[in-house]
Amino acid sequence: MKIAILGANGNVGARLVAEALRRGHHVTAVARRADSKADTAQLTHVAADIKDPSLPAKLRGHDAIISSIHFTQAQSDDLLALVRASGVKRYLVVGGAGSLEATPGKLVVDAPDFPAIYLDEARAGKTFLDVLRGVDDLDWTFLSPSALFVAGERTGHFRIGSDTLLVGSDGKSWISFEDYAIAMLDEIEQPKHLRQRFTVGY
């Protein structure tokens, strides 16, 4: 498959690139700073902002686009316009945990002890998800990580959920970037959450 990854230089984006290449896919890695000298037969780097008028043409013909960009750094309208202009129907979003339910009817982001430093990003992520839920012309998927989202090991062992924060038997809610990337690529290869949000955790 041909997969384009927006925000390919970030913590999550880099793991998504690595996982896609590991599975033999052809990857277009899009970032504001990209080195075409690092291109290979499987990997093409594109230096572009999401508003770059030349970007839609470079994404045309891909099987899927993954957006791994902070919600406070890009407007949903701009991202959706880019995907639509590219003609690619499969659109996957690296989401946040804030929009998950901690308990029925209570979102993680609304908890009194939610870290203030992440508040704007979490609220923007919830808004983005709300916008996506009204989109019916793209085959979108929004994948939320667990509360703690960090570098770790690629184990291949994790749980999948829907709209509720996953918490382990040890009381912790977390997932590594590496295992998150596995869940995202699994969804691309075998779609099970079209026009849905799902979550991943241990």
Q: What are these model-predicted stretches?
A:
Residues 7, 31, 95, 144, ...:
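Short beta-strand/turn micro-motifs composed of small residues
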Residues 3-5, 65, 91:
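Conserved hydrophobic beta-strands of the Rossmann-like cofactor-binding core
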Residues 119, 126, 134-202:
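C-terminal substrate-binding/catalytic lobe of Rossmann-fold NAD(P)-dependent oxidoreductases
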Residues 29-36, 147:
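Short, polar loop motifs at secondary-structure junctions
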Residues 3-22:
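N-terminal Rossmann NAD(P)H-binding glycine-rich loop of SDR-like oxidoreductase domains
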Residues 71-158:
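Glycine-/Pro-rich loop/turn segments that contact NAD(P) or position catalytic residues
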Residues 23-27, 137-139:
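A generic structural motif
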Residues 35-86, 192:
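NAD(P)H-binding glycine-rich loop region in Rossmannoid oxidoreductase-like domains
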